[in-house]
Amino acid sequence: MSIWDTLFGRTPRYTPGTEPDHSFGRYTDAYKSRENYAAWDRAVDAFEEDRFLDSCAAFLEYLRDEREDNVKWQREENRLYFEFYQGSKRVTGFADREQLRATARIARLERPDTDPLRRLTAMNYELKYSRFALDADDCLTIIFDTPVIDASPHKLYHALKEMALRADKQDDLLLEEFGGTLSPVEVTHLAPLSAEEKRLKLQFLRESIQSVIDYLGGGAINPEEHPGAVAYLLLELVYRLDYLLIPEGHTMEALERMHRMYFAREAEQPVTFKNVRLLGELQSLLRRAPEAFAEELYGGKSTFGITLPASHDRLSGLIRNELPNMDWYQDNGFPEVARAIPGYIAGYALFNYAVPPPDRDLLQLYYRVSENVYFQGLGYRQEFLGRDGRPARRPLKAAIGEIVERHRREYPRMRPVTSHLSFDNFADFGRSYLEMVGELDLSRP
């Protein structure tokens, strides 16, 4: 920052490329490179020509994400060995002229206990391609195998995705529930977070939940008269915690359960009842031991995403449907609820959809502004709020321009109208920002 910026209270210029490289949100494999898609075509062609090992090798090349360094393979004569990562789990396997087999160890059974075995046996009925088993080393394992003649790229994708996602989800849940019986296995690939980052994330979790609880308990809004407002506040919080903290295990399952519960088609449950359940779940997270939450925070690589790809039109429709609901709350003295609605839209989209990369980057930039203090704590130096607490015009427009340049090759028609952005207050900024995002042209020539 120059002396003139300091004297006049200006926000420093946007300086891309100098920020830390933290990951946020759920991994998606929905948008691959041209090289990945070319590898898929080779895999299909090789399978149709009965060149099964060539097909498997090309399929693994399709799965590989260079940024994640998530898939490795090696061919030795008539065998192909491979491994890939999904969060906390490593999947290993091989293919030869007869079969393809993949396994992932979930946890080690330290002493006989039928409860976790019964749990996984019951889950086998939910699986289409894979199965849980106990291996020779007393490790709870998930297995997929198939004759190579039946190992088409389409089948391999769905089967390996099923086993990888199940393994990644179940290890933390089983270890928490059966900690006296099970122990972690094959977790050396995980990148531990620093104690300071864990402390910061725990603080963010607790302060965010407590802030909403305090607002609802302060009498500013009647939850019986305005259940929709309460729902916006609670769901915005759920999606924000999921995207910014990326928790695993119990916390991730709790956040997903809250989403499922609220949107379950249960005609007899009024919104007020669902809000009470949401609030109870959030209070339970608040009461958890810090060390339990800390164990759910780690860095890992992923290969498969759990969100389905969605077009820009889907996001635009969500914005058009939800954004007008801000009007009543702004006009009737509920600024906190009005501010929560753009956050709800951004969070809902990132939680449920694999939106196009420009949309994802722009929605994350929204979080950079709304949670400026949190990002500063993570080491991001760029300020997106001025000293008066309002969104900062210059760095925001520069950051939007940098996102446009990053995606210009794939989306040459993307031209955000930044002149319509409002910087008067955060609610107006959120409205104008999402309107700008919704009006983008992400069609390709």
Could you say what each language-model-derived stretch is?
Residues 217-226, 242-250, 328-331, 415-419:
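Charged, low-complexity interaction regions
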Residues 103-137:
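Short, internal acidic amphipathic alpha-helical interface segments
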Residues 156-170:
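Short amphipathic C-terminal alpha-helix that caps PH/PH-like domains
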Residues 3-105, 109:
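N-terminal catalytic cores of peptidoglycan-degrading enzymes
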Residues 234-337:
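Charged, long alpha-helical assembly modules
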Residues 175-232:
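Charged, amphipathic alpha-helical linkers/stalks
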Residues 325-445:
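Charge-dense, extended regions
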Residues 134-158:
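Well-ordered alpha/beta subsegment
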